[in-house]
Amino acid sequence: MKNEIEAMITDITATTAEAEDYTGEDGLLYCGKCHTPKEVYFSKETAQWLGHDRHPAECDCQRAAREKREAAESRQKHLETVEDLKRRGFTDPAMRNWTFEHDNGRNPQTETARFYVDSWETMQTENIGYLFWGGVGTGKSYLAACIANALMEKEVAVCMTNFATILNDLAASFEGRNEYISRLCSYPLLILDDFGMERGTEYGLEQVYSVIDSRYRSGKPLIATTNLTLEELLHPQDTPHARIYDRLTSMCAPVRFTGSNFRKETAQEKLERLKQLMKQRKESL
């Protein structure tokens, strides 16, 4: 047993020398590349106890290689985590590319969206959400997705969906309604896109209220986008809508979106590009 322990100590304290390595004036092994020690002396007491006076150490180039390898592994793990979050978090895969980096910078509310990401810890702690409201095509969904993507890059789990998808999932789900809603509300941030566009049936409104109320009770922030006006949200048409809108407006700070319809502008740009391509083809014939 004693011999086995001694052999183990010898293996642990042994240093493997490369061809270019050399012994320095202090008696330690030095790296032939970076000329820093590959060994360190034990304290006198430890050396007497172990029967060995030195142990291996990283030279500068070994340390640099290890740090580079660990950084690459960490980066790869981060990329895999973010990819998994985006795959799970978006019901529309196209939204994975809706980022601040791809933004044209023309939306006046871009800084408001960036502020939410930069202040995420406070937004989460104080349960502050956004209600993006305004006309069609003004960039509400895009900036909401920008927030989602930016937080996912920080490895924060976000779910961005809409009530059309939620109602379909509830109808087709093999798990119970409560379990589905609980899973939806477990995300640190929930984003409901195109709020108010869902079916106005009694069943649909009841499910909408259930999700909104469950999110409210979870104490976690919610972001919603809607084409409804603030007037419509503050003065609903009936009691079922009043219950829903009251919960929503108590959770989310309203942010108005005005200005150009970016979708119409994009469609016009594509039309002009098509005309240009057709003209070029005609001229080449």
Locate predicted features.
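Short glycine-rich substrate-engagement loop in P-loop NTPases that contacts/grips substrate
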Residues: 108-117, 125, 148-189, 199-206
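Active-site donor-binding loop signature of nucleotide-sugar glycosyltransferases
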Residues: 61, 105, 163, 257-259
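Pre-Walker A (pre-P-loop) alpha-helix and adjacent loop at the N terminus of AAA/AAA+ ATPase modules
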Residues: 88-130
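Walker B catalytic acidic pair
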Residues: 194-195
